[in-house]
Design a protein with these regions (language model features):
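TPR alpha-solenoid repeat register
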Residues: 66, 99-103, 140, 174-178
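Short coil turns that delineate tetratricopeptide repeat
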Residues: 61-62, 95-98, 135, 169-170
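TPR/TPR-like (Sel1-like) alpha-helical repeat modules
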Residues: 91-92, 149, 154-172, 180-183
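TPR-repeat structural position
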Residues: 46, 64, 80, 117-120, ...
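Alpha-helical linker/edge segments of TPR/alpha-solenoid repeat scaffolds
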Residues: 111-120, 152-159, 183-202
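Tetratricopeptide repeat
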Residues: 50, 54-57, 84, 91, ...
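Long, contiguous interaction/recruitment modules in multidomain scaffold/adaptor proteins
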Residues: 1-51, 55
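Alpha-helical adaptor scaffolds
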Residues: 36-41, 72-76, 81-84, 88-133, ...
Length: 202
């Protein structure tokens, strides 16, 4: 299948995955003060409306936790583009959040679901980092493959699928699908490597 078709198909899988990744409230140590917002407690508990959180963020744009909560509201509303932007901002303004593994996965999933192609490379980088911290987590594995395919990082996708195979029952349909995927990815990785060699020749 074409790369374009593969990317479109990613959205369906990632839409399901992001529900799992972002399900439940985001708990973060060291809740910030929200004195400017009358319903501060609701925001801190994740119960405020998207509008209330957005209004609060205008007065506290560096509150990473609030950006994450705002992203969750946007995910619930199906606005993955806004969610991706909010999560990216959260990571930029709050170093602790930038290191949060679940936020890394949420960001990657939101970018892929929104088909923010300009951010595919960044999403792949972030998800790759998360995978390095939680390689045995099925969410990280699946999203790492999806992000690598979206970013056309074929060699990395091959590495992840190869690592997954030993943990899949060899007589299962999932194993056969994984093997077929691996063959496809290996072919694309080889083609990309050959193309790169051609480009560097004088």
């Amino acid at each position: 299948p074409s790369t374009r078709l593969s990317r479109v198909q990613l959205a369906v899988s990632v839409a399901v995955l992001i529900t799992v990744v972002a399900g439940g409230s985001y708990a973060f140590l060291g809740s910030p003060e929200m004195l400017e917002l009358t319903n501060a407690q609701k925001v801190m508990e994740g119960n405020a409306s998207a509008e209330s959180i957005e209004a609060y963020l205008k007065t506290a744009p560096k509150d990473g936790r609030a950006w994450v909560l705002f992203a969750h509201k946007k995910i619930e509303a199906g606005d993955f583009r806004a969610a991706a932007r909010a999560l990216r901002t959260a990571r930029e303004v709050e170093p602790k959040i930038a290191r949060d593994r679940d936020v890394m996965l949420e960001y990657g999933a939101a970018v892929l679901t929104a088909q923010e192609s300009d951010w595919y490379a960044d999403a792949n980088r972030v998800v790759k980092e998360a995978y390095g911290l939680m390689a045995d987590d099925p969410r990280a594995e699946r999203l790492a493959v999806m992000a690598a395919i979206a970013a056309e990082d074929w060699a990395w996708a091959v590495d992840v699928v190869r690592a997954m195979l030993p943990r899949i029952p060899p007589d299962s349909g999932e194993y056969m699908q994984a093997r077929e995927t691996l063959v496809m990815l290996e072919a694309r990785a080889k083609a990309a490597a050959d193309q790169k060699k051609t480009e560097v020749k004088p």
